[in-house]
């Protein structure tokens, strides 16, 4: 007999765990709603619908609160949720996405009925009629008017959000982003109109209100508003009188309390300006005073509410000015300043989470689109549109950007705006911050609210993270292509051309707006690059949009593009070059910054190109910093020692010096090195070159016969003076030296000195031979008797000379003396001898101090070059390097016999000793230190920017901006940099005068 097993009666209702509910009270809340009381298909569908809410726990809690509210009519709502799928989708979606709208529903429990049935979005006019009707009903009781309007506004937000979100829960239509943004703008218009009606009633009573137009700006003006956003407005009155201003002010107050923050900060003169102006007053302001950003803001202007005729007059008068704004003299400067300001607004710790202002974010798209509109809208009325999406379409249609790029950028923009909407809906707070990367719960909620589902490889949160990376990268890449790809297509070979492409005039306009002062030359350089034969031209076509975009942020994009062309032509045979720029964005970006800032480095890179490969990062940080200057110095000397021919030896030394200069200057320009490290590295390589040259010349001049055959007749030491002795060389510094010799056994002094002088002169001549590299000038004029004295002396001769005839300036010069090359033991003995002169046991004589002061006064009066500005000459100007160094040296002369720490050739270390000994108050020493560092940075930056030694800061303009960047100033605002330089050096000069006594 066959026994049949009874079928298992497995419950069909899913458990809270299967539904994704994690709140410990979830089961209790389900029971409270009675949703586990009936095991039927309707309840199964209901529960699975709840599980699809972005946050089912939040939705469940809101439903329980609603059920506990007497006026909600829970029996009716509960029954409707079982049978009405659209209502279920809308309500669960909005409660699982917005805690704030859940609170609103609990406060207004009958509002759930707005989500029932065939719900559609009202038109602009229908919304205005709703709000007007509410005002008419409420004006009998003005105290309740704004409360009722606030409720109506939140109800309309509830309906929109429910329709916007419903597709996350049920199979409902998806509202396009543009529809949502436009409806939010219509809702804002209706709310503003209602607030204006109430304001007129409050201020004017039964009197006729003044004529007032409210111009919507920003996202509201462009009809692309967020769920939560300030609404930017400008007020235009028939008269700018007290009553009109009171109405405008009252309208702002009412709307800000009831709906959203109303901001009139875009008005002429900003918050300092009059709240209301007439049309004529606006015209006068924009004709005379308005900045470029104010014309950019007018791109979005729209007459929203109030007096329509006034609004029309305002727009008719001002909009033509928008389309000629790019002809203004300061257009490029202001546009670049706006880009920088936007980037600096974002704190570093949240930059990766900023959906609006971060890299590859919304502002990148909006700014680029608006700039292209301003540049090309003058000659193309199809670009006279307000919304970003419409403008992208028009730019693609007009050939100003590729149509595929326009479509991709629009898709990325709408995706990022969708996330922005979802983030704001949660608490109805203005925010643009994505959740923390490790906040799994928040990321998962955002993914579900944005209707992102698992893809088989990742859960919803993982898919969102991948999509964000993809979209940010795409925006960043398209941001560059947006500006430059059409330019390249307009100059490229036939295979690259597109229909409706950009004309040469439009291309020149666009390049000028992007900061190129010579757009015609820039186009020629671009054409030469992309039209190279074979693979190189194709790779350049791919690379250039990104490279040019990065270069446009540099102070001198014209010079940078020329340098890039020269570099590319010089390295045409190096296969690694373009591959590195293509595959390593960090290298390419840093290279563009260097080329667009410096005239000094490009020539070095052409002859030492492998340094470019070090622009990337290694495991321990920037590879430019992996090189040890001391190791470079040893390698340089060793390399030169392999050659018997001095010319070849010095050529080998120059090669390594060139590479080291390129490395140090590149790291300096990229902000990787402190100025003191730069000076030490430059000193190290100079010392190595001196050692290599001296060794080579000694080898070449060894006697061929006689008792000294193959042996040097004398030992030679090179004493570094000035900045070389203090290890404070800059890019444009000469090497101040003295040569000292000591005869070999059996060689008389005169023969030894003759031989050593010949070697020293050959060292100077060989190093000073003109070449394509930065010069190697050796200056021996600080020796006793200056130019009139012998080039080389014996140690005994130096001792006798200093003991008997040392002049005050010679004593002062010895304060910086340091043995740098040649015979180390002889150099050490020279310094011991010099100590007796520069640090005498009883201090220097009062007469010597007076003479130093007199010479300083004469230097101040006579040494400054003709035409130089004494305030901005970094070496001899007020509070410049000479002032600080002479002050330190005077204090050394006065106190070194008492303060051993002053037996030092370094300016900064002596300043530390001066402060430690209390010779000058610490705060004043700090002023001297800051001035020395500031002037040294500026002087180095001048050489980096101009490519040749100079000490005079330029006046305001592009070159000063470049100097500011090269000197490490946080922006390329040359004026700010100059103000800081003047302030720092002025304060230091006061200390200098105090120490010198006059």
Swiss-Prot record:
Its UniProt entry gives the catalysed reaction(s) as: [glutamine synthetase]-O(4)-(5'-adenylyl)-L-tyrosine + phosphate = [glutamine synthetase]-L-tyrosine + ADP; [glutamine synthetase]-L-tyrosine + ATP = [glutamine synthetase]-O(4)-(5'-adenylyl)-L-tyrosine + diphosphate
Q: Isomerase: present as a keyword of the record?
A: no
From the UniProt record, which GO molecular function terms apply? Answer: [glutamate-ammonia-ligase] adenylyltransferase activity; [glutamine synthetase]-adenylyl-L-tyrosine phosphorylase activity; ATP binding; magnesium ion binding
Return the InterPro entries for the record: GlnE, GlnE_rpt_dom, NT_sf, PII_UdlTrfase/GS_AdlTrfase
Look at the named UniProt entry and state the broad enzyme category this protein falls under: transferase
What SUPFAM superfamilies has UniProt attached to this entry? Nucleotidyltransferase, Nucleotidyltransferase substrate binding subunit/domain
Q: Which GO terms describe its cellular component?
A: cytosol
EC no. given is: 2.7.7.89, 2.7.7.42
Q: Which UniProt keywords apply?
A: ATP-binding, Magnesium, Multifunctional enzyme, Nucleotide-binding, Nucleotidyltransferase, Transferase
Cofactor(s) for this UniProt protein? Mg(2+)
Q: Name one GO biological process term.
A: regulation of glutamine family amino acid metabolic process
Could you name the domain of life of the organism this protein comes from?
Bacteria
The reply to whether DNA repair figures as a keyword in the UniProt entry is no
| Pfam families membership | GlnD_UR_UTase, GlnE
Name the segments for region: Adenylyl removase: 1-487
Residues covered by region (Adenylyl transferase) = 492-998
Cited function: Involved in the regulation of glutamine synthetase GlnA, a key enzyme in the process to assimilate ammonia. When cellular nitrogen levels are high, the C-terminal adenylyl transferase (AT) inactivates GlnA by covalent transfer of an adenylyl group from ATP to specific tyrosine residue of GlnA, thus reducing its activity. Conversely, when nitrogen levels are low, the N-terminal adenylyl removase (AR) activates GlnA by removing the adenylyl group by phosphorolysis, increasing its activity.
Family (UniProt): Belongs to the GlnE family.
- Matching NCBIfam families: PRK14109.1 (NF010707)
Name of the protein this chain belongs to: Bifunctional glutamine synthetase adenylyltransferase/adenylyl-removing enzyme
Protein species of origin: Mycolicibacterium paratuberculosis (strain ATCC BAA-968 / K-10) (Mycobacterium paratuberculosis)
């Amino acid at each position: 007999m066959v026994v049949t097993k009874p079928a298992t009666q497995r419950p069909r209702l899913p458990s809270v765990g299967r539904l994704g509910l994690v709140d410990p009270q979830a089961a209790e809340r389900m029971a409270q709603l009675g949703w586990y009381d009936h095991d039927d298909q309707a309840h199964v569908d209901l529960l699975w619908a709840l599980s699809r809410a972005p946050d089912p726990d939040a939705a469940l809690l809101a439903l329980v609160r609603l059920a506990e509210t007497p006026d909600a009519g829970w029996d009716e709502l509960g029954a409707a949720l079982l049978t009405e799928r659209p209502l279920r989708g809308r309500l669960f979606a909005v409660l699982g996405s917005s805690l704030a709208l859940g609170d609103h529903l609990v406060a207004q429990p009958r509002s759930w009925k707005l989500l029932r049935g065939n719900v559609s979005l009202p038109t602009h006019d229908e919304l205005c009629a709703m709000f007007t009707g509410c005002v008419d009903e409420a004006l009998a009781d003005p105290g309740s008017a704004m409360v009722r309007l606030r409720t109506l506004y939140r109800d309309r937000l509830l309906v929109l959000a429910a329709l916007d979100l419903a597709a996350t829960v049920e199979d409902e239509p998806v509202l396009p982003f543009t529809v949502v943004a436009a409806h939010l703008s219509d809702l804002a218009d209706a709310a503003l109109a209602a607030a204006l009606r109430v304001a007129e009633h409050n201020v004017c009573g039964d009197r006729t209100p003044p004529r007032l137009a409210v111009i919507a700006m920003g996202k509201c003006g462009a009809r692309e508003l967020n769920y939560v956003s300030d609404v930017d407005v400008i007020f235009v009155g028939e008269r700018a009188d007290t009553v009109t201003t009171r109405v405008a002010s009252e309208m702002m107050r009412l709307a800000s309390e009831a709906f959203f923050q109303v901001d009139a900060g875009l008005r002429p003169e900003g918050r300092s300006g009059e709240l209301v102006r007439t049309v004529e007053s606006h015209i006068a302001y924009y004709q005379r005073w308005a900045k470029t950003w104010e014309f950019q803001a007018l791109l979005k202007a729209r007459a929203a509410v109030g007096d329509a005729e006034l609004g029309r007059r305002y727009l008719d008068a001002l909009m033509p000015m928008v389309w000629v704004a790019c002809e203004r003299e300061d257009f490029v400067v202001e546009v670049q300043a706006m880009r920088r300001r936007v980037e600096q607004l974002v704190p570093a710790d949240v930059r990766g989470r900023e959906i609006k202002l971060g890299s590859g974010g919304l502002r990148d798209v909006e700014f680029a689109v608006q700039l292209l509109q301003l540049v090309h809208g003058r000659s193309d009325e199809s670009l006279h549109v307000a919304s970003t999406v419409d403008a992208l379409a028009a730019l693609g249609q007009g050939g100003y950007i590729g149509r595929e790029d326009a479509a991709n950028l629009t898709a990325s923009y709408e995706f990022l705006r969708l996330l922005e909407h979802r983030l704001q809906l949660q608490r109805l707070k203005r925010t643009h911050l994505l959740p923390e990367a490790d906040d799994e719960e928040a990321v998962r909620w955002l993914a579900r609210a944005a209707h992102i589902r698992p893809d088989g490889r990742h859960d919803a949160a993982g898919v969102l993270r991948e999509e964000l990376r993809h979209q940010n990268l795409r925006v960043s890449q398209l941001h560059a292509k947006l500006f430059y790809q059409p330019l390249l297509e307009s100059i490229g070979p036939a295979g690259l051309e597109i229909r409706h492409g950009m004309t040469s005039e439009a291309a020149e306009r666009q390049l000028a707006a992007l900061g190129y002062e010579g757009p015609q030359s820039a186009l020629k350089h671009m054409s030469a690059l992309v039209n190279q034969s074979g693979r190189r031209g194709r790779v350049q076509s791919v690379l250039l949009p990104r490279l040019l975009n990065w270069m446009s942020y540099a102070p001198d994009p014209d010079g940078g593009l020329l340098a890039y062309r020269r570099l590319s032509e010089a390295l045409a045979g190096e296969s690694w070059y373009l591959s590195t720029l293509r595959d390593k964005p960090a290298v390419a970006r840093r290279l563009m910054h260097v080329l667009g800032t410096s005239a000094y480095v490009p020539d070095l890179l052409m002859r030492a190109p492998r340094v470019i490969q070090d622009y990337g990062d290694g495991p321990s940080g920037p590879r430019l910093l992996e090189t040890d200057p001391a190791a470079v110095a040893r390698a340089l000397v060793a390399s030169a020692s392999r050659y018997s021919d001095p010319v070849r030896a010095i050529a080998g030394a120059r090669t390594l010096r060139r590479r080291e200069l390129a490395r140090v200057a590149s790291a300096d320009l990229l902000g990787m090195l402190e100025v003191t490290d730069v000076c030490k590295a430059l000193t190290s390589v100079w010392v190595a070159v001196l050692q290599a040259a001296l060794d080579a010349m000694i080898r070449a001049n060894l006697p061929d016969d006689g008792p000294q055959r193959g042996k040097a007749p004398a030992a030679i030491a090179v004493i570094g003076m000035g900045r070389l002795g203090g290890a404070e060389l800059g890019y444009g510094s000469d090497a101040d030296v003295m040569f000292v010799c000591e005869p070999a056994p059996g060689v008389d002094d005169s023969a030894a000195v003759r031989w050593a002088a010949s070697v020293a002169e050959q060292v100077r001549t060989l190093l000073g031979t003109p070449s394509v590299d930065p010069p190697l000038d050796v200056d021996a004029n600080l020796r006793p008797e200056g130019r009139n004295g012998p080039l080389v002396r014996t140690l005994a001769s130096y001792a006798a000379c200093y003991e008997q005839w040392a002049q005050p300036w010679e004593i002062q010069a010895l304060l910086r003396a340091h043995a740098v090359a040649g015979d180390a033991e002889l150099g050490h003995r020279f310094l011991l001898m010099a100590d007796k002169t520069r640090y005498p046991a009883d201090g220097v004589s009062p007469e010597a101090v007076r003479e130093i002061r007199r010479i300083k006064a004469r230097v101040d009066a006579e040494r400054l070059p003709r035409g130089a500005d004494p305030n901005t000459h970094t070496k001899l100007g007020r509070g410049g390097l000479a002032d600080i160094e002479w002050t330190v040296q005077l204090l050394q002369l006065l106190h070194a016999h008492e303060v051993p720490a002053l037996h030092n050739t370094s300016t900064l270390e002596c300043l530390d000793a001066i402060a430690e000994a209390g010779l000058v108050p610490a705060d004043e020493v700090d002023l001297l230190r800051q001035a020395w560092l500031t002037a040294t940075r500026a002087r180095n930056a001048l050489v980096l920017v101009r490519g040749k030694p100079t000490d005079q800061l330029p006046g305001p303009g592009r070159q000063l901006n470049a100097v500011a960047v090269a000197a490490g100033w946080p922006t390329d605002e040359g004026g700010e940099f100059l103000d800081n330089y003047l302030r720092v050096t002025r304060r230091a000069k006061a200390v200098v005068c105090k120490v010198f006594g006059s």
